[in-house]
Regions:
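Beta-strand residues in well-ordered beta-sheet regions across diverse protein folds
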Residues: 22-24, 54, 138
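Beta-strand elements of well-folded, non-transmembrane domains
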Residues: 12-16, 25-29, 41-47, 141-143, ...
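Solvent-exposed alpha-helices and their adjacent loops that cap or buttress functional pockets
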Residues: 3, 45, 128-129
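Beta-strand-rich recognition/accessory modules
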Residues: 85-164
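Active-site/ligand-binding surface loops and adjacent short beta/alpha elements
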Residues: 30-117
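Acidic, contiguous internal or C-terminal segments within carbohydrate-active enzymes
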Residues: 1-35, 39
Length: 164
């Protein structure tokens, strides 16, 4: 399937305060290769109309994958709301908070290492997918990561629940 030597370890730790993940990608061969990675996290929400994704989005460059062809844009908003089909890669935005006023809860998405970008995706309007009951907020390493022979890359994520 892929002719490069590698090993991937994925660790999940659950405490009273957070859910923590660590993904380690190791090049176990001699030749360098590139890879991309993302954690496709689908979060249960009360309704998209109650959702805000807060973070350092204002001024950030994002790849709008809904455009044909996809192109880079600049985000004007500090907090994101979803009212249409959405597929964007926010480059350099690695921490954010998912706020759900319908549940009165918030979830801090803290990318502690490796994950440099955030992907926000919603199939808004697709009833068959239950679009109004979830939002995908992915921790990503969108640009190619190069691993030399024997080298490794680590991505660490903490999900910390809280109130509004």
């Amino acid at each position: 399937m892929w002719d490069n030597d590698f090993c991937v370890d994925f660790t999940v730790s659950l405490t009273a305060a957070s859910l923590d993940t660590k993904m380690e990608v190791r090049n176990t061969g001699d030749k360098a290769w590139d890879f991309q990675a993302a954690l496709h996290s689908y979060f249960d929400v009360s309704s998209l109309k109650n959702i805000e994704v807060a973070g350092s989005f204002a001024g950030a460059t994002y790849l709008d994958k809904m455009l044909d062809p996809p192109s880079d844009q600049t985000e004007a908003r500090e907090a994101l709301t979803i009212s249409e089909e959405y597929d964007r890669v926010y480059k350099g935005v690695n921490d954010c908070t998912l706020k759900d006023s319908g549940k009165g809860k918030a979830l801090a998405i803290n990318n502690n290492a490796g994950w440099k970008d955030t992907v926000v995706w919603s199939p808004y309007g697709d009833e068959g997918m239950g679009f109004d009951s979830f939002l995908c907020v992915e921790s990503a390493a969108f640009d190619a990561q190069t691993l030399e022979g024997g080298a490794s890359w680590v991505g660490e994520l903490s999900l910390v629940p809280g109130g509004l």
